Structure formats: structure tokens, C-alpha cells
């Protein structure tokens, strides 16, 4: 057992567990529901052999503002129910599912992202995912989408309809090496208000033949 508040306001298990690579299952006790963490930064970072999380419904995230690196390098984590996450106060989701290569499906349909500003590398190298419906995400405050889907090499479709991209300043390598994408609908993207860096945005998207955009899509620097 570990205390919930350790270094940098994160639980003791983040910094004081030398055996993270041996952990295959995490179980949240019902008593954990009484805790009100303010950050989930790096909670399971480096748990490379973690396959399942039980009792995640007892994790109350209503006060959490930071989820970056939360599951970074949880390469063997399989389908997990995130539907109970309260993300209304979260501002940073960068690298949240970075290198979660065994996730074959990801339901974050209940995520409220109205305060999120950083989605950098959020799904980086999620090679198990073949489709993502993210049309519900509120991206009105997001300024960074760098590397968001980079190396999602098996992603066949991604629904980004309804996204508000007026505040995004970087889409660098956003879809780089999404080698299986054939079409991409960015018709809702508005990049006129910011000078948006787009370097390598579609690098090595070898199968991508069609990109739908509107007259609101101003080609940024580095494309």
C-alpha cells in the first residue's frame, strides 16, 4: 500500500515502486473512492507489463487537472473502461496513452475536454487501434496537437468532425507514419487565426490519398 500524495503531489507508488515492470494488474479498493487527487501525472508511467486495471470506477477524478503521461508506456494494457472519468477540470492530456500498443479499442466518449490545452502525443504509437471516434471532444482551448496520432500505424479511420482548432499553434507530425490511413476528413479544421506549425504533419502516410479540407484550412509552416 502507498500513500496517495508523494513527490510532486503524485502517489508514492509513482516514485517509490522499483518493481513497476513486474506489475501486471492494478486494483483500486472501494475505499479509494474517498480520495480526491488533483493530479494523475505519470500514475502508471512505465508499467510496461500492466494488462488490466480493476476497480477503476473507484478513482474519482473530479478534481484532477493533469493527466499527462498517465498511462505512458503501458504497452500491454488492454481495453479499459474510462467511462467514469470526470475530466471537466483537466488541462493537460499530453502523452496520456503514449505507446499503449495493446489497446485495441478506446472509449473516451464521456471525456469532457473543455479545459484541455495540451493533447501532444496523446495517442502516440497506439498501434493496436484501427479506429477512433473523437468527434465529441471539445478542442476549443487546445493549443498543442503535436504528434497526437504519430505512429498509429494501423489506424484506418479517425473521426475528428466538430473539432474547433482555432487556437491550435502546432500540428507538427500530427499524423506522421499513420501508414494505414487512406482518407482524412479535416473539413472542420479552422487554422486561420493562428500561425500553425504543420511540419511533417502527414509524413510517411503512404496510403493517404484523400484529405478533405475547407477554405478555413490555412496551410501552416513546414507542410
Predicted regions and their residues:
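LRR flanking "cap" motifs
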Residues: 1-36
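A residue-identity detector for tryptophan
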Residues: 13-15, 43, 163
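Intrinsically disordered regions, especially transient/low-confidence alpha-helical propensity segments
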Residues: 10-12, 40, 160
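Register-specific detector for alpha-helical tandem repeat solenoids, activating on a conserved position
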Residues: 41, 68-69, 94-95, 120-121, ...
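Structural signature of tandem-repeat unit edges
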Residues: 21-35, 49-65, 75-91, 101-117, ...
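Non-membrane alpha-helical segments in proteins
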Residues: 38-45
Amino acid at each position: 500500500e502507498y500513500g496517495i500524495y508523494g513527490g510532486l503531489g503524485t502517489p508514492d507508488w509513482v516514485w517509490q515502486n522499483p518493481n513497476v515492470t513486474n506489475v501486471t494488474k492494478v486494483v483500486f479498493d472501494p475505499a479509494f473512492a474517498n480520495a480526491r487527487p488533483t493530479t494523475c501525472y505519470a500514475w502508471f508511467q512505465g508499467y510496461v507489463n500492466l494488462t488490466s486495471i480493476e476497480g477503476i470506477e473507484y478513482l474519482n477524478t473530479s478534481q484532477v487537472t493533469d493527466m499527462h503521461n498517465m498511462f505512458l508506456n503501458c504497452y500491454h494494457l488492454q481495453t479499459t473502461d474510462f467511462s467514469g472519468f470526470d475530466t471537466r477540470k483537466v488541462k493537460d492530456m499530453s502523452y496520456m496513452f503514449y505507446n499503449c500498443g495493446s489497446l485495441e479499442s478506446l472509449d473516451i466518449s464521456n471525456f469532457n475536454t473543455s479545459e484541455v490545452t495540451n493533447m501532444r502525443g496523446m495517442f502516440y504509437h497506439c498501434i493496436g487501434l484501427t479506429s477512433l471516434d473523437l468527434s465529441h471532444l471539445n478542442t476549443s482551448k487546445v493549443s498543442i496537437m503535436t504528434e497526437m496520432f504519430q505512429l498509429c500505424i494501423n489506424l484506418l479511420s479517425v473521426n475528428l468532425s466538430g473539432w474547433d482548432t482555432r487556437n491550435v499553434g502546432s500540428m507538427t507530425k500530427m499524423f506522421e507514419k499513420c501508414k494505414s490511413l487512406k482518407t482524412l476528413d479535416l473539413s472542420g479544421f479552422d487554422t486561420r487565426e493562428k500561425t500553425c506549425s504543420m511540419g511533417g504533419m502527414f509524413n510517411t502516410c503512404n496510403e493517404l490519398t484523400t484529405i478533405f479540407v475547407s477554405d478555413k484550412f490555412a496551410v501552416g509552416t513546414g507542410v
